[in-house]
Structures are given as C-alpha cells and as structure tokens.
Regions:
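Hydrophobic faces of well-ordered beta-strands that scaffold small-molecule active sites
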Residues: 4-8, 41-45, 81-83, 117-119, ...
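Gly/Pro-rich active-site loop or hairpin
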Residues: 129-133, 137, 161-210
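Charged helix-capping and loop-helix junction motifs
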Residues: 21-27, 63-66, 97-102, 132-136, ...
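Short loop/turn motifs at secondary-structure junctions
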Residues: 2-4, 37, 77, 113, ...
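Active-site acidic/histidine proton-transfer and metal-coordination neighborhood
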Residues: 51-152
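Alpha-helix-loop-beta-strand connector modules within alpha/beta enzyme cores
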Residues: 23-43, 100-112, 139-144, 210
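N-terminal pre-domain/capping segments
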Residues: 1-45, 49-71
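Active-site beta-loop-alpha junctions enriched in small/polar residues
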Residues: 11-13, 45-48, 86-88, 120-126, ...
Length: 210
C-alpha cells in the first residue's frame, strides 16, 4: 500500500473482553511495521469506554479497559491512543470532563512510556462531551504539566462539521479557532471523513470522502 501511518484496534472495540498480546506477537508486529515503513502507528480504544460516566459499574469497566489498552499500545510500541471524551450520563458536563481528565492523568502517571493519548473531537450527539474545542481544552488543562506532552487531540472532520465548525466554507478559520483554543501543537491526528449530517446537526454519521 505504501502507507506511512496507520491506526488499528488492539482488540474488538465493541466487546469488554480483553486481549493479551504475547511478547512474540508484539515483536512480530514491530518487525512488520518497520519493514513496511510505517512511521506513525496507533490504536483507537474500545467504543464502550466512558470515563465520564456516573455509573459505578460502567466506570470500573472503563478504567480497566482504558488502562489495559494503554498497556497493549506500549507493548506494541505504538505512538498514540485515540480515546473519546465520553458521555456525561448524569447531565453534569463539567464533572464529566473533570473526571475523564483526571483518570487519563492517573493512567499516564502510572505508565511512564511514550504513548500519547489523543482526545477525539465529537459531533455532540446526546450527552457526548468534546464537541466544542473549549471542552477538550478544559480536559487538557486538568492534566498535570509533567504529562501535558503526552496528551493531544484527534480532529475528526465529520464530527467537527456536525458540531458546527464550518470546514467546508471556512477551513482556515476553523484551524485558526483550533489554534486559539487548543494550540496547534496539540493536534496529533486527523480523521478525514465527510459527514452525512448537515453543518451543526450534531449527528454522528460519517460518509465516504467526496
């Protein structure tokens, strides 16, 4: 293919069941990546994870799954882990953002590797957090300074368009806003998609580019 960057799933994203990666599997992956010339590689964590939830059972599962995902990324030598900001199931957005950020910070503190956590922008459907750049900025600001270099943003073009950022009509303006609110240095990855929803619809529906 000639690809120089890739994103994978290290386990089934729709299941809680964890996957152990053996040393042999990890070594084989690292060799294959080097031989293929893939310079940047990372993972997207489970879609079930919600570090902003107020449900104790779901939160416990989410913490375990997120930490296990970080460990697999480290074992495979991946550069980044994309994660969603979660859903404020109790309706308190500020509390959800704070809880998510603190749990990410805890995971980074316990794992002194190089894997960078990238918070993905969302469309803002339902109680989804992170559809405004300011919400993601609030999360990053709660991460201690010593770990700040290991947290960034994954900008999903379909999501930000549905959230009301007019990439179609004012691409440069959106990037300027991103830079003003978050800092362009936080941009670690772009998910390039078109949107089935209209501008500002807050519908999380991807479409093929073009």
């Amino acid at each position: 293919m000639g690809a120089t960057a890739m994103q994978i799933f290290t386990k089934g994203p729709q299941r809680w069941a964890e996957r152990c990666i053996s040393g042999e599997e990890a070594a084989r992956f690292r060799r294959a990546r080097a031989e293929a010339g893939v310079g940047v590689a990372g993972s997207h964590d489970s879609y079930l994870i919600n570090l902003a939830t107020s449900d104790p059972e779901l939160l416990a599962k989410s913490i375990r799954a997120f930490r296990a995902e970080m460990d697999r990324c480290d074992r495979l030598g991946l550069d980044f882990l994309v994660t969603h900001p979660g859903n404020a199931t109790a309706g308190n957005r500020k509390a959800g953002l704070r809880q998510n950020a603190e749990l990410i910070a805890d995971a980074l503190n316990e794992r002194p590797g190089v894997v960078r956590v990238l918070i993905e922008t969302t469309a803002g459907a339902g109680s989804a957090l992170g559809y405004r750049f300011e919400e993601i900025a609030a999360m990053i600001e709660r991460v201690p300074a010593e770990h700040r270099a290991r947290i960034g943003v994954c900008l999903d073009t379909a999501h930000v368009f549905a959230a009301g950022y007019d990439l179609r009509g004012d691409y440069e303006g959106v990037l300027e806003t991103f830079d003003e609110v978050l800092g362009i240095d936080t941009l670690g990855l772009i998910h390039c998609n078109d949107s089935l929803g209209t501008l500002g619809s807050r519908r999380d529906r991807h479409a093929d580019i073009g």
